[in-house]
Amino acid sequence: MKQKVVSIGDINVANDLPFVLFGGMNVLESRDLAMRICEHYVTVTQKLGIPYVFKASFDKANRSSIHSYRGPGLEEGMKIFQELKQTFGVKVITDVHEASQAQPVADVVDVIQLPAFLARQTDLVEAMAKTGAVINVKKPQFVSPGQMGNIVDKFHEGGNDKVILCDRGANFGYDNLVVDMLGFSVMKKVSGNSPVIFDVTHALQCRDPFGAASGGRRAQVTELARAGMAVGLAGLFIEAHPDPEHAKCDGPSALPLAKLEPFLKQIKAIDDLVKSFGELDTEH
């Protein structure tokens, strides 16, 4: 079955093409740290021949605690993204939380992301669609894979069909997430075979029910990423940090930056193998 291709400049994203890495840091902690992390990603992905898009948030508007670090904000965040693009020649993805942010952010970055908690907010979806930018839609933890078709339809009605879907797990009782591997193919089907990617970092979240920040299971990042990529996906979404224990957001789920290259070698090997098989129709 023909898979839809979404182009991010010269990077083509599709379920049957070599996977694209959407990777970086959870939130912009400082200009210098962003430069350091981006440079490492660029070096490793160029060495391994993996198409790459840098990821970071300029504002974490949905932190659990009012006391948690949110980021540098829109103006300073866009300055950092512009410098990263100019210095390393990378594409950039970041999330928006309000309709008023959509166009200013789309003027700077290459992909704008619809956060999972906001994925059904029609005014935000319409504002993002109007930018004409490539869109990455995070599947909410509380929405079934089949319901993602309705969100995609909103973007299409807004005149934008450059949509990528991203799974980051589903609620499993309170304060825990699991990944339904069967859901990836459902998301492909209901979206007209749009590219589907896997956010392995946030799928590893778990939390203390009375805590102020999410916990995580980064010790299991490799096995979960292997399983997801074995399905045959358009891309992998992952966050890394040189010192996860002291990251300002989601450190417990972040891959240690020093482990990025050996991790990606395994992921690329699995992706290459799975996509060498071709499609096998077992329904008929």
Curated annotation (Swiss-Prot):
Q: Keywords in UniProt for this one?
A: Cytoplasm, Lipopolysaccharide biosynthesis, Transferase
Catalytic activity reported: D-arabinose 5-phosphate + phosphoenolpyruvate + H2O = 3-deoxy-alpha-D-manno-2-octulosonate-8-phosphate + phosphate
| UniProt entry tagged with the keyword Transferase | yes
Q: Which GO terms describe its cellular component?
A: cytoplasm
Q: EC number(s)?
A: 2.5.1.55
Q: Which InterPro entries match?
A: Aldolase_TIM (IPR013785), DAHP1/KDSA (IPR006218), KDO8P_synthase (IPR006269)
Q: Does the keyword Glycosyltransferase apply?
A: no
The protein here is known as 2-dehydro-3-deoxyphosphooctonate aldolase
